[in-house]
Amino acid sequence: MEVGPLMSQNLSQVSATNEAAAAQEDPRRFKLIPFTEMTPDQKRYADAVLAGPTVASGSAAAVPGAATIGAPFNVYLRSPMLAERLRGVAEYIRFKTSLPQKLNEFAILVTARQWGAQYEWFAHHRLALKAGLNPAIAEQLANGQRPIGMDADETIIYNFSHELHTTHVVSDAAYKAVVDRFGEQGAVDLIAVNGYYVLVSMILNVDRSPLPGGAKPPLPPLK
């Protein structure tokens, strides 16, 4: 049957509508790659993630038996060699850092707030609270406020991280406070967790990674 101009136009509109609906349902720019469609290098990386400590943390992005892996790992798959190198860095920063877990997660939340990284905040908020961060401190931070009621260590971490993100340098006072409390290794590990999660924030924001289960974005816009 010959398709007339009007019908052709209608079909085009339907197609465009369907494409828009699909995009709305899955806003990811880097679409999920099922295990069955991964290259050998991608599969090796994905298997390594699933065999690592991320799974035990309860990450929704790394679930044994799932059809694929989620963000940011799904994005890293596009560059398997980079992905494998970042995996070692990420596992050190998450699980082997010299900083106490609560403070490490607090620094991640500071980074997520600065970058408006909804997925990153969603993933690490529960980990920070589980590690002992006061929910009121997290709530104030989410609202773009300097949290009231921080203990001495939290204040040191916040001051250093906030200065680093907002001014791109740190004052002598902020630096000295970190080194005096956590040593030079602690200072380097604190720089590293802030820096690595800037990368993660960039990955997630560029990808437009959706929150699991259609969760509401936890971070309000900053004024």
PLM segments and residue spans:
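Acidic, carboxylate-rich catalytic segments that either coordinate divalent cations
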Residues: 178-179, 195, 203-223
